[in-house]
């Protein structure tokens, strides 16, 4: 039997997200879908331009804020998809993820793409979370 669940939406940067037409995260039951995080300031301007490692750190920082809003950590992440405009540089810096995922790595995909929403963005990371009670 499927029970109805009311989605719970979360905006990290409400004005930016409304301008672009997305919600940063939505929780339904024990599952959370988190939109791709990019390296931006609160006004939506790209940060760490040209520095993929710092952009990656900024993505994880924003994702951590979303996870904490729902009482979760990176240990609850079950899917991580990474989109990057520079796969060789991402692969060279991917070891940073060892400081994020300390118990186990999630499933996911690493995809090299031609471009992201703004030309300055070099990486975008989206997550799916499952929180057991």
Describe every region a protein language model picked out.
Residues 1-61, 65-70, 75-78, 84-133:
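N-terminal presequence-like segments and the immediate start of the first folded domain
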